[in-house]
Amino acid sequence: MTDIEALKAITTESIDLENVPVEEVFQHLKCTKEGLTSNEVQERLTLFGYNKLEEKKESKILKFLGFMWNPLSWVMEAAALMAIGLAHGGGKPADYHDFVGIVVLLLINSTISFVEENNAGNAAAALMAQLAPKAKAVRDGKWNEIDAAELVPGDIVSIKLGDIIPADARLLEGDPLKIDQATLTGESLPVTKNPGASVYSGSTCKQGEIEAVVIATGVHTFFGKAAHLVDSTTHVGHFQKVLTAIGNFCICSIAVGMAIEIVVIYGLQKRGYRVGIDNLLVLLIGGIPIAMPTVLSVTMAIGAHRLAQQGAITKRMTAIEEMAGMDVLCSDKTGTLTLNKLSVDKNLIEVFKRGIDRDMAVLMAARAARLENQDAIDTAIVSMLSDPKEARAGIKELHFLPFSPANRRTALTYLDGEGKMHRVSKGAPEEILDMAHNKLEIKEKVHATIDKFAERGLRSLGLAYQEVPDGDVKGEGGPWDFVALLPLFDPPRHDSAQTIERALHLGVSVKMITGDQLAIAKETGRRLGMGTNMYPSSSLLSDNNTEGVSVDELIENADGFAGVFPEHKYEIVKRLQSRKHICGMTGDGVNDAPALKKADIGIAVDDATDAARGASDIVLTEPGLSVIISAVLTSRAIFQRMKNYTIYAVSITIRIVMGFMLLCVFWEFDFPPFMVLVIAILNDGTIMTISKDRVKPSPTPDCWKLKEIFATGVVLGAYLAIMTVVFFWAAYETNFFHNIFHVRNFNQHHFKMKDKKVAAHLNEQMASAVYLQVSTISQALIFVTRSRSWSFVERPGFLLVIAFLIAQLVASVISAMANWPFAGIRSIGWGWTGVIWIFNIVTYMLLDPIKFLVRYALSGKSWDRMVEGRTALTGKKNFGQEERMAAWATEKRTQHGLETGQKPVYERNSATELNNMAEEAKRRAEIARMRELQTLKGKVESAAKLKGYDLEDPNSNNYTI
């Protein structure tokens, strides 16, 4: 039997690879522990396929038609059926042109939605490809990082802490693993997997490191077989609920208008059947914001692409709106606020064991480090050697214990040149100290050294050593000796202080969450200007803390927490959410996953584990806090575009329904349905550009405020409807425009209205005039709703302006020159066209003040702050007490010499000025320190601080005067 034929037997699952001995697994899979060659991989990919589940292929036709299947489209489809099925009689031909127009409008919206979503889907697929799970496998005799989708049965893979198991596999020699199988079996606790056991695709490694041989991939895995049994659930997010609420409001408004028209037309006016149908069609076609789902989804998709360009990949689209409302960010210190580029000052190493010097301590620490797949600490330690190979020179490695959150240390068991067994371990000082046989004797000195390091912003790394006389690799060995404490320095990022200040001005409170000591956290907070109001994780356990306040208040007011474990992160997020905060949380490890899932916005930082990425909403591809704050601003801009459009959509619904209903009720004026279609089509073309509009993000956290959206929309829409009625009255009932502008007189009292031909002629001209008035001011409204302050001072996007000008040029030409009997309009000439533009300009001038009045009524803000535009004129919500935070931050920055007074960070030159001030403050401090060191007092104090002596304590016996 050839190798291929033998492997084909595996695909039929006639061999139980989960239960046969591991040696037989290699025989059946025709592989060795040296892995596969590239040719073997290609053959197996052809046979087994890629390591991914089968994707359901969606029909493009059904997907296209799906954009016509929503409540707003149903109303338009009902209008189309009315036009073709009910609009007959009354001495008029069948309403085919209206039917065709409605279908064209539906097709235009569906086409735009289909194309944009397809483009967004392709872009999203490309972005998500960056997040595709990776796996370390032996190929052609070398370890390589490959896409997990390229794994095949027979591959040798490495599994370590934080990895999501990429395929079903059997474990080889090594230490037991702790595997979280909750996603597969529902087991809440991790299970122990010994060498030889099976691990399944989709589970997570919680502890340990080992090699394994892949036995099944793709649809043949345990997860793949169960996937088809799981029904996908439809989750209705907050964004969808908002869309539904706005859509329902518009539909209800139309229903009310139609009910009034039915009662008046058929009950009071006793008019014909066809007249009523045409008037109802006007409300149905013009009132429905048919483009709303398209505009909002396209806006969000384009926004997600921009976020990705800034280094923040959005896994869940609705996370954008939550990011816009985030008011508290719980940030890791290491790698986010700091560079995560550790260095060790050899001169400061404190040695505790006789016979060991600092060079030997460094060598021992390097032995307890990995030479490959190093973390930041391992890199810092090994880089201190002249040659990294020195770490293993003259010894034989027997067993390496990798770091895990449970023991917080690494260890190496090895044989020296004489064949004696030794073990060396490095890790968290408390863990190392607990192992020492003489911990009670050295405890005070160790803690004093740790505190001395912490006061200088240095982390401590403990180092211990033991002999293993019995020669048992897994035995306990002899007593542990505490060898040394190594100081680790992780410098803050150059932009962290400025970014934190920027966040405070944006209403986002940044809290430092770190596993380091409290003194280190406070020193880092002081350097970054974020405050030193920090607490140990023990203060989270009960309300009996030294501050005498509840834990909730403590968390809300704290600048950060030190000595934090992953479970503390979860508790912090939970309590902040209970205080009505929208909370973001950064994380990178497997144990951060619960907190990332719990947070409103889980943010996996650069180089996070697969488990952390899987639990997050946003994945960063660049390090640092500035990426997050930039993403916040971008999210607010995206959210602002969506909110601007929803206000516009509600306004247009009200102005169409109310305006044409009043004309019908009081003047029996019948506006042609086809011209409403023209308005809708031109509006759609213009409004689509709002997804790329230039907007000013909210200076404070923002969220959906339906009360504001509906109130602003109703008032603005009602105003425009009333102005349409005023225009109609002035043109149809008076000589006002004729006398002032010397244009053709449309006053009905100057015509023989009993003559049907004359009346029809006048009505067609009035329809053309009303069409231009409604079209122009309706589209101009978007410039009002898109701006936070005066619309003429916030420059709109180029595409929006061009689209508006083209649409209104078309509308003006139609009104001035078009004679369309089928559409019920007749040309009014360029004179009347100019008059209507002047009327609409005057109408437009009152829109901004009305917008301010509505927001003033909703928020209660003073007039000065209202028109200033910097507070968004929206209902004020206590987003983490932003005034208190901003005042506190200013005070702290002033104390540190970083700022001389109030200066908003969003001024154009503020970034440069802040950098200059920071450099100047740093230079002044350095000059003062150097001068002080030249004095006897300065030298004594400097030496005392270095030794850990307290000169302020008169009872101290560490020195004499």
UniProtKB/Swiss-Prot annotation:
The encoding gene: AHA7
SUPFAM superfamilies, sorted: Calcium ATPase, transduction domain A (SSF81653), Calcium ATPase, transmembrane domain M (SSF81665), HAD-like (SSF56784)
Name recorded for this polypeptide: ATPase 7, plasma membrane-type
Catalysed transformations (reactions): ATP + H2O + H(+)(in) = ADP + phosphate + 2 H(+)(out)
Cysteine pairs bridged by disulfides in the record: none
Localization terms from the record: Membrane
Protein family membership: Belongs to the cation transport ATPase (P-type) (TC 3.A.3) family. Type IIIA subfamily.
Database matches in InterPro entries: ATPase_P-typ_cation-transptr_N, ATPase_P-typ_cyto_dom_N, ATPase_P-typ_P_site, ATPase_P-typ_TM_dom_sf, ATPase_P-typ_transduc_dom_A_sf, HAD-like_sf, HAD_sf, P-type_ATPase_IIIA
Subunit structure: Binds to 14-3-3 proteins. The binding is induced by phosphorylation of Thr-960. Binding to 14-3-3 proteins activates the H(+)-ATPase.
Protein function: The plasma membrane H(+) ATPase of plants and fungi generates a proton gradient that drives the active transport of nutrients by H(+)-symport. The resulting external acidification and/or internal alkinization may mediate growth responses.
